[in-house]
From Swiss-Prot:
Pfam families: tRNA-synt_1c (PF00749). The keyword Aminoacyl-tRNA synthetase applies. It comes from Janthinobacterium sp. (strain Marseille). A motif ('KMSKS' region) lies at residues 239-243. Keywords: Aminoacyl-tRNA synthetase, ATP-binding, Ligase, Metal-binding, Nucleotide-binding, Zinc. This is Glutamyl-Q tRNA(Asp) synthetase. SUPFAM superfamilies: Nucleotidylyl transferase (SSF52374). Catalyzes the tRNA-independent activation of glutamate in presence of ATP and the subsequent transfer of glutamate onto a tRNA(Asp). Glutamate is transferred on the 2-amino-5-(4,5-dihydroxy-2-cyclopenten-1-yl) moiety of the queuosine in the wobble position of the QUC anticodon. Binds 1 zinc ion per subunit. One of its GO terms (molecular function) is ATP binding. The gene is gluQ.
Amino acid sequence: MTNKYIGRFAPSPSGPLHAGSLVAAMASYLDAKAHQGQWLVRIEDIDETRTVADATTAIMDALAVFGMQHDGEVVVQSQRKDLYQAAFERLKDLVYPCGCTRREIADSRLGVAADGAAIYPGTCRHGLAAGKTARTWRVRVPDANENNEAINFDDRWLGPLTQHLASEVGDFVLKRADGFWAYQLAVVVDDADQEVTHIVRGTDLLESTGRQIYLQRMLGFPTPHYMHVPVVLNDVGEKLSKQTGALALDLAHPMDELMKAARFLELSLPPVNSITEFWRVAIAAWARRFAQE
């Protein structure tokens, strides 16, 4: 890893930005600016079933209101399917077709991963059962007794972490039953193609990190530095999202929204009178905590 810094904010266009997504955007923006680096924006619409019309425009307009200027072109995942296909073909010795339904995997009672998904028991690892047709394509992970099964990484917010793919996830999906590429493959390909060196995102994506590092290694890609910041919760302790009733940000009062997000990220800032001044003091405060890492 060189001294250059390329970070990114990668929202899904499933609705307008809310308080939780502003925290993620702010953390990634502050970290990039504190390191005198680039801050990219990527629209992660690989799951086209969740895409909301005009959401991308609304997201970009909101970032502009908050004074967050991106570097380079905005990359859109749905326009990059050839790259994902090429990466999939490079993994041909590790991937296999799977005919299992979600119910069948859940009924295996092998357990549930930290992100709520059932751990895959390896049913189709050695071939499809009689009468089964391929629904998804999975990538084989190392067995629990193999030396490279444990994925170790240093998280810049949480410290040293280890994920065991065999026992915590199992072989995971690269191509979905509906024909769309899985998030894990798309994000790894995009980060490598855009030369992303630092990933700052919410802890809701922490459980994906082991899978992504594994794919990076199998594809010969460099592994970025990771930081997983706390996520905003709703009144009943659920991650704030469009699905849990998150309200759109108040673009008429951007300073109020920025200050709330900064407080959530444990930044103690003096009163400011403009968005430009907010970013000046916020970047300086973030740099004092993280710019030497």
